[in-house]
Amino acid sequence: MRASKFFYKTLREDPKDAEATSHKLLIRASMIKQIASGVYAFLPFGHKVLKKIETVVREEMDRIGGQEMTMSIMMPAEMWKKTGRWELYGDDMIKFKDRKEQDFCLGPTHEEQITTLAGQLISSYKQLPQLVYQIQTKFRDEPRPRFGLIRLREFVMKDAYSFHDSEESLKTTYDQVLNAYKRILERIGLNYEVVAADPGQIGGTLSHEFIVPAEVGESTVFKCDSCGYVATSEVATSVLPAPAFLEKPALEKVHTPDTSSIEDVAEFLQLSKERIIKAVMVIGDSRPYMILVRGDRELDESKMNRRFTQWRMMTDEEILSMGFIPGFVGPREGINEITILKDKSLESLDWGVIGANERDYHIVGVEVSELPFHEIVDLAEVAEGDLCPQCGSPLRSFTGLEVGHIFRLGTRYSEPLEAFYHSEDGERKPFIMGCYGIGVTRLVSAVIEQHHDDFGIVWPWSVAPYHVVIIPIGDVEAQVQELENTLSSAGLDVFVDDRDERPGVKFVDADLIGFPVRLVVNAKKEGKVEIKFRKTGETLLVGQEDVLDTVLRGAVNL
């Protein structure tokens, strides 16, 4: 391919609205162009990267027996209403009416459609298991698209679905896909973590995320470097370090004027926030709850969402109507009308301070073990430095991009959609299902987040738009054509920068775009070719007959 005929335009300055490194470089290197908020066109360079990633994904899915198909993007509301997700997705789903006033959506995911199809096509256990996948554009009306290709309203995703007659069969396929995802990420040059995760709106009994460490990541992950425990913040558990030892004071009601916040109480009593016991009042699934949690911790929203179908904080009026004083709440005698949940964050606390249910008063010296409760729960946020629940070593945290997510769904979709098969004993049973997603467009950004320097993108060999850029200097067209033919015949993608520009401009663009190998053919070098490897910066001067072998040997490390 010749640059003089290529559809691109590089930029010297970062776009003003771009925050993420990958977003800046994708725009500057003419990989993508924004069409609207969260909507991008893939230009030829970016398109080639996208298709190379798709090829890797396709090869690994085919390797484990996946069958590629294409489902419709446009779906009727009925199937979504059967699973309850027409309402659950809310404004994130792009909905519309056709000319007959029938409700439709643009698919954000395809569990409903594939389950309906399976119910129509699979009738016997003899046809199980099945694994199908597609690589397709999805649509979600994100409230705040950001970071270029990281949070989009229109994106390419590989989604796969499996159907089984037993949990054992599901586990086998789940593990096969998990390992396939590992190979995909390794082949495209990514460092990653496989972490226990929250199933979220997809649902199911078990899920894992594939997290690529990155500064602009929207996922927080906690990891123990001693035993390998790793989980996202939504499902992570920990053991809190005990606060510094303090002799327990006598149980006493203490006047604490104008101290309705945890910080105020701690400062007034000259104690750390760890010693304060919060009593958080919520309405969960239409019932009142008091959640006791250590004062230096907040409730984790994802954990609360798993505990309750719907929940919210009580208003001051609601708290008063139940006989409690806002800002000074604590357990009291005879409160049978409310369920008390005691959070695990209190396990490391021997004594503390809690509201006295009287304005401007707290009770000091409360034995935590004697607090009344109905159930012990894990609803508090985990923090860096907490102790690993498996081995007791400190946890560290890092941010990352979720690039893949796999789920054991069970019968979450097959039951409401009445997708059944006949078992070996003739019984009619719902399919046991798994689903498996990997964000193809997000992988483009993830690769750049991990592979760039001050000069631009450093593409791994496997996904580079072109493996080699040839930069001619002087009258060397015959030599360039011969090199181009030799490299192309060996299966390499070759880009010739034949623009009428100074060599320095071409060198800057070569680094920005991120070609793994740069060849400079200079009329003054008497048949020698300068080879520069983008990743290492290594530069060699070799005869033209040695270029192919030198490039292929160097490619092993790119």
Swiss-Prot record:
GO term, biological process aspect, one: prolyl-tRNA aminoacylation
Superkingdom in the source lineage: Bacteria
Primary location group: cytoplasm
GO cellular component: cytosol
Catalytic activity field: tRNA(Pro) + L-proline + ATP = L-prolyl-tRNA(Pro) + AMP + diphosphate
Sorted UniProt keywords: Aminoacyl-tRNA synthetase, ATP-binding, Cytoplasm, Ligase, Nucleotide-binding, Protein biosynthesis
E.C. designation(s): 6.1.1.15
CDD domains (UniProt xref): ProRS-INS, ProRS_anticodon_short, ProRS_core_prok
Compartments in which it is found: Cytoplasm
Family assignment from sequence similarity: Belongs to the class-II aminoacyl-tRNA synthetase family. ProS type 1 subfamily.
HAMAP family in the cross-refs: Pro_tRNA_synth_type1
Function, in words: Catalyzes the attachment of proline to tRNA(Pro) in a two-step reaction: proline is first activated by ATP to form Pro-AMP and then transferred to the acceptor end of tRNA(Pro). As ProRS can inadvertently accommodate and process non-cognate amino acids such as alanine and cysteine, to avoid such errors it has two additional distinct editing activities against alanine. One activity is designated as 'pretransfer' editing and involves the tRNA(Pro)-independent hydrolysis of activated Ala-AMP.
Subunit and partners: Homodimer.
UniProt remark on domains: Consists of three domains: the N-terminal catalytic domain, the editing domain and the C-terminal anticodon-binding domain.
Descriptive protein name: Proline--tRNA ligase
Organism encoding this protein: Coprothermobacter proteolyticus (strain ATCC 35245 / DSM 5265 / OCM 4 / BT)
Gene (UniProt): proS
